[in-house]
Amino acid sequence: MGVLMSKRQTVEQVQKVSLAVSAFKDGLRDRPSIRRTGELPGSRRGTVEGSVQEVQEEKEAEAGTSVVQEESSAGRAAWERLRDGRGVEPEEFDRTSRFTPPAFIRPTRKLDDDKPPEICLEPREPVVNDEMCDVCEVWTAESLFPCRVCTRVFHDGCLRRMGYIQGDSAAEVTEMAHTETGWSCHYCDNINLLLTEEEMYSLTETFQRCKVIPDCSLTLEDFLRYRHQAAKRGDRDRALSEEQEEQAARQFAALDPEHRGHIEWPDFLSHESLLLLQQLRPQNSLLRLLTVKERERARAAFLARGSGSTVSEAECRRAQHSWFCKRFPEAPSCSVSISHVGPIADSSPASSSSKSQDKTLLPTEQESRFVDWPTFLQENVLYILAARPNSAAIHLKPPG
């Protein structure tokens, strides 16, 4: 009987030891691994100083892994912002008093999207701004900021709490919103928001294949390299011609009016979004993107430049450049603020081309040809959309 009891005790002891070893291994597996290069003979392991040193080493190891995780999460966050149509989040912003922006849902194309829309020259469309703030949906006697593209209006405080204006930019927005120049709200300022999910997926895939990093500025070398890689997509033997490369360089200069040597990410994204819209959308689909204010702006330009129901092809070409000018010669009957917000520098390529366009841009043959109202709209719709952002950059440079 005694022998049987000793065997059972032995088994129980072995089981207890096995459980203890398993628990110890599990604890080591959960702890962050710390590589020890070897203990010196005079090591302080087991002392208070040794314990403090071990804790410090553990913190350093955890900090190293957290840095790697932060870098990878920052990259994922950049692609997520690009996918969702959001800009760079403000790093130093008091989020305790911030309004939560509504979830953005990308537009979808309807079945009749490619059918001609009914945009008549006459009668004129009435332009009436909303009465309530788009953020808080409250009407107050305070001055509201109207968007020059859509009919939305905003409170100064609401824009601050949403994080769309910060610091000194509030005074600039206030000045622009109540002048002829006008101001574009955060919906209209970002042309990328016009893309559908499928179009955005195509653009993101192109960026990834061409190794474009979101939220980073691009130099002329980066821009030309991207243009070459994008041209070779689907056809490795295809390359940009010398003329196309010069055109890309002129577009880069138009996107960099201040001659800083690089273009900002929002300007590059708007430019690429416009090119994708031009490539994938029919003209009728693009016309449906115009707001009532933009349609009235086009009517004013057509009536001011033509006589009756037609304008010369030369005037139609000049109109493509006029959307990017700070001031626009409106018709007397139009009371809508229609000018583009970005002034063109005197030394910029766009300014020099616009000054000499009457002499060199348009041949004499174009003066004798005429276009009607629908044709005028189709040839100007992309440049009207390109004039939406508040940036001074020209996001789609007209030919010439």
Curated annotation (Swiss-Prot):
Domain of life: Eukaryota
Disulphide-bonded residues: none
Gene3D superfamilies associated with the record: Zinc/RING finger domain, C3HC4 (zinc finger)
Gene Ontology CC annotations of this record: cytoplasm; glutamatergic synapse; nucleus; synaptic vesicle membrane
Zinc-finger ranges (PHD-type): 129-190
Phosphoserine, modified sites: S43, S51
Biased composition (Basic and acidic residues): 28-38, 78-97
Positions bearing Phosphothreonine: T47
Residues lipid-modified (N-myristoyl glycine): G2
Residues where Omega-N-methylarginine is found: R36
Keywords: Lipoprotein, Metal-binding, Methylation, Myristate, Phosphoprotein, Zinc, Zinc-finger
GO molecular function: transcription corepressor activity; zinc ion binding
GO biological-process terms attached to the record: detection of mechanical stimulus involved in sensory perception of pain; gamma-aminobutyric acid signaling pathway; regulation of G protein-coupled receptor signaling pathway; regulation of synaptic transmission, GABAergic
Region ranges (Disordered): 28-99
UniProt cross-references to PANTHER family, sorted A to Z: PHD FINGER PROTEIN 24, PROTEIN KINASE C-BINDING PROTEIN 1
This protein's name: PHD finger protein 24
Gene symbol of the encoding locus: PHF24
